[in-house]
Amino acid sequence: MKNTNFEMWVADCERNNIQIWQLDYDKDTDIGIYMTKSSYWYNNNQYYNSPVYQLWIGDKRSICMENYQEVYKIWERLVSESKDR
């Protein structure tokens, strides 16, 4: 059984200790926004990298950026356009 791109991405994040949160998802259009966040250790202190927001349309990652407002605007537009068809 072949894994989808999304499943491979999730497995890769788990393997690299990158946390994933599903922020928004529209079941009808299969478009979702996910936030990933990673951390690292330096001098016995744990630091977190800036979160990265990823827009997935079906099984394809379409957009990846650090600005949630921009990703959310694009997500809203895509969901709206898909439902208008």
Predicted regions and their residues:
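Acidic, low-complexity, intrinsically disordered interaction modules
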Residues: 15-77
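Extended non-catalytic interaction/regulatory regions in multidomain proteins
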Residues: 4-19
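Position-driven detector of the extreme protein N-terminus
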Residues: 2, 9-10, 36, 66
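Short intrinsically disordered terminal tails
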Residues: 1-4, 8, 79-85
